[in-house]
Amino acid sequence: MSNKEQKDMKKSGKHQRVHKTLPSDDFKNSDAVNPADKPAVGTSGMGSHSSGSDMQEAREPVQKKMQDFKGDDGTGLLMEKRKQFEEDVNASFRSLNENLQSILKAQQNSRQELKSLYCERFGSVYHNWLVEMDRTRDQEEYFSFITQQQMKILQTAIEDHETKLKNAKDMCDTFLKVW
């Protein structure tokens, strides 16, 4: 790495990146700790109260599970989980559908009850309104007929009055001529 690159790295506060192809220190160091070689907790020198057979019995279920898992690559477990998931989803949809159906029925029943209540309360009011409208229409026709009759009577009275005025005027004219 050049001097300039080193200065840039110091200024930016970043650490130098190690290239992937370079061997790590573990390969150079022969004493590197391999987790598979040494257990995290050493039981040999600690004076364990359990015997070796107890330890072996404790490891057997874990090893058996590991072999089962490695044996079928987890596809059986995944298929079981997938099947369970599908069943859960289908059950959720069924319960959701049932809930929606019950809500829909409840709303329909509520609407039907409101409609019957409305018809009960306002049906008679509507019927009375129709009767009043018919009565009003009949009265309108009657008053229209009476108004026409009164107009005819007034028209004849006006004509009679005009004739009487004309006759009175003619009499006055003849009387004035005579006198």
Swiss-Prot record:
Position of the signal peptide: none
Predominant subcellular localization, coarse grouping: nucleus
GO-annotated cellular components: chromosome; nucleus
Coiled-coil blocks: 146-175
Tissues where this protein is expressed: Expressed in testis (at protein level). Also expressed in ovary. Not detected in other tissues tested.
Keywords: Chromosome, Coiled coil, Nucleus
Basic and acidic residues bias (residue ranges): 1-11, 56-75
Pfam families: Cor1
Annotated localization: Nucleus; Chromosome
Biased composition (Low complexity): 42-53
UniProt-annotated stretches for the region Disordered: 1-75
Family stated for the protein in its record: Belongs to the XLR/SYCP3 family.
Protein name: X-linked lymphocyte-regulated protein 5C
Organism listed in the record: Mus musculus
Gene: Xlr5c
